[in-house]
């Protein structure tokens, strides 16, 4: 959740290290991260030893839960049942948390981020690693599909899952979705 800007725990650190090992043969030119500590830390661990420039961008920060920040959606006794149901099953129509954002808000700001990358000639042939969060990442990925309402696209992504996308002539294609570089049984 956004306002709880927490560091990765030991398990998160391990997943980021394993993901970095799995991606070691990919030549990246740039890292763009959400400004939240856990996203920056993930990027640093995945890209360890590469000495790449990192830019932070608030447009890929996680969905704000506003007054409900810090509540675990799955286990909450505070969140309205309709909110929980829509969050998992129809996030596009999920109500905005009081003082927070809707998924549609996040779709708009991640679309702006996506368009800024696509339209920037400096990134035309660049391989960019983007470190973001579950909801923000899925909203960013929606730019590659016609149907923007199917946000989760089969489920909430696992920690450190990777989507590989390609943009040619302004058209984005998802090459791989939710690839993981670790054994889930660990």
What do these predicted ranges mean?
Residues 63-77, 119-126, 142-186:
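Acidic, low-complexity terminal tails and accessory targeting/binding regions
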Residues 126-132, 136:
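Beta-strand elements within well-structured catalytic alpha/beta cores of enzymes
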Residues 27-29, 124-128:
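Short coil/turn segments at beta-strand junctions that form active-site/ligand-binding loops
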Residues 18-84:
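Phosphate-coordination/substrate-recognition cap region in phosphate-metabolizing enzymes
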Residues 45, 139-143:
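Active-site signature of alpha/beta-hydrolase-fold catalytic machinery across serine-
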Residues 84-105:
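Short glycine/proline- and acidic residue-enriched helix-loop micro-motifs
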Residues 38, 136-137:
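Alpha-helix capping/helix-boundary segments
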Residues 1-41, 99-110:
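Loop-to-helix element that buttresses phosphate recognition and phosphoryl-transfer chemistry
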């Amino acid at each position: 959740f956004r306002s709880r800007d927490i560091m990765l725990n030991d398990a998160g650190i391990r997943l980021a290290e394993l993901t970095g090992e799995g991606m070691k043969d990919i030549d990246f030119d740039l890292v763009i991260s959400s400004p939240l500590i856990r996203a920056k830390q993930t990027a640093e661990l995945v890209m360890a030893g590469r000495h790449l420039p990192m830019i932070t961008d608030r447009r890929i920060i996680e969905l704000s839960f506003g007054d409900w920040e810090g509540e675990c959606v799955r286990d909450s006794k505070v969140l309205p049942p309709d909110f929980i149901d829509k969050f998992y099953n129809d996030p596009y129509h999920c109500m905005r948390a009081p003082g927070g954002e809707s998924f549609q808000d996040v779709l708009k700001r991640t679309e702006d981020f996506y368009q800024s990358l696509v339209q920037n000639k400096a990134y035309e042939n660049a391989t960019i690693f983007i470190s973001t969060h579950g909801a923000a990442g899925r909203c960013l990925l929606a730019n590659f599909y016609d149907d923007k309402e199917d946000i989760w696209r089969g489920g909430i992504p696992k920690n450190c899952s990777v989507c590989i996308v390609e943009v040619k002539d302004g058209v984005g294609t998802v090459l791989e979705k939710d690839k993981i570089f670790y054994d889930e049984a660990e």
